[in-house]
Regions:
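The feature marks the mature, well-folded catalytic cores of soluble enzymes
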Residues: 1-81, 99, 107-338
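Short Gly/Ser/Thr- and charged-rich N-terminal loops/segments
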Residues: 83-87, 93, 98-106
Length: 338
């Protein structure tokens, strides 16, 4: 069986994920033996999480923050006791100061562990909690998300005096959306799709006779967002302001993948099971090419999917590492000659 294999050239990590993983790896290289705690998965890809876990990155939830603070305190207390016995307390003080300098963060309590905020961003209370626990924070919030958070705060300040409403198109419970809600104390309406929009209007959750402003989670479908905004514009009687907040890198991927899917006989889409962006892009490929298969790793490939002479396209989400795409491509090539 002869197969022609091509990896879509723009597939792989987006800029925000590259930045977050780069900073995590740099910290782990410079602080050998130390643990770096990521608040939530740094990327929604199981294979990449295993790779980073091998280097010392530990994923935790918000409920774990108090525990890592206590572990860091206990470890520091034991360290100080040993240093005191050796008459090297000055060296311990210097080490604590240099830790804050190397991470680029100020920290009044050098006893804390180091916490990484991933590209999705966090609500303000997360930073307050980390500070109260004495944790050193490495903030890897994507610059695109930071701008969106700022825009949402400003919109809320405009809308509140006029009794208006803030609407967010995004996945309920998604880390980025939770971070956005946190900017306005949760006082916004989140809609996941057109059906939810219509339902909210019907039951009074969205008041179309008041000023409205709508934003999108940065990784959502541009086409779906456009349709939702059009529907709202027709119904809003007191005016609506639509904000273009989908990441340009994500938006361009939709057009590129649609074209890529059409010019191949079969598409192998690679992404983690929990990737929201992966679900959206997989469905996009599937609508363009029915012979589209979703896998998380090369071991899930099946020789029965392929036919002699197939042009095989391999692509992935913004959370799919390039090394994994290359691994899948090599595995597909291995079916040739069978």
């Amino acid at each position: 069986m002869n197969l022609e294999v091509e990896i879509e050239r723009h597939s792989g990590f987006c800029g925000g994920v590259i930045r977050a993983i780069g900073r995590a790896e740099r910290f782990l290289e410079e602080h050998s033996g130390e643990t770096l705690y990521s608040l939530g998965d740094i990327v929604h890809n199981e294979a990449e999480l295993r790779r980073l876990g091998g280097k010392g990155l530990v994923t935790i939830s918000k409920e774990d923050l108090g525990n890592i603070s206590k572990r860091a305190f206990d470890g520091k207390r034991r360290f100080d006791r040993l240093v005191s016995l050796s008459n090297h307390s000055d060296r311990s003080h210097s080490r604590s100061l240099s830790l804050s300098k190397r991470t680029g963060q100020s920290n009044n309590n050098s006893q804390g562990a180091t916490l990484l905020i991933r590209a999705h961003g966090e609500p303000p209370e997360t930073y307050s909690l980390a500070e109260s626990l004495g944790l050193t924070v490495i903030d890897c919030t994507c610059p695109v998300v930071l701008r969106l958070q700022k825009s949402i705060r400003e919109a809320y300040e405009r809308l509140k005096p006029a009794g208006g409403q803030l609407i967010i198109f995004g996945k309920i419970g998604h880390a980025e959306v939770l971070g956005l809600l946190g900017q306005v104390g949760g006082d916004a309406v989140v809609i996941e799709n057109m059906a939810m929009l219509l339902s909210k209007i019907e039951d009074g959750g969205i008041l179309t006779d008041r000023p409205l402003e709508i934003f999108s989670q940065t990784t959502k479908s541009p086409v779906e967002y456009s349709l939702i905004c059009e529907e709202l514009s027709v119904r809003a009687t007191a005016g609506i302001k639509v904000h273009d907040t989908i990441c340009s890198q994500v938006a361009s991927r939709h057009e590129e993948l649609a074209e890529f899917a059409l010019r191949h006989d079969i598409i192998i889409f690679v992404s983690g099971a929990s990737s929201s962006n992966g679900k959206v892009l997989f469905e996009l490929c599937k609508t363009r090419n029915p012979r589209t298969y979703h896998i998380s790793e090369a071991a899930e490939l099946s020789a029965g999917w392929f036919s002699d002479g197939d042009k095989v396209g391999i692509c992935g989400a913004t959370s799919t590492p390039g090394w994994l795409l290359a691994q899948v491509a090599e595995a597909v090539k291995g079916f040739s000659g069978r």
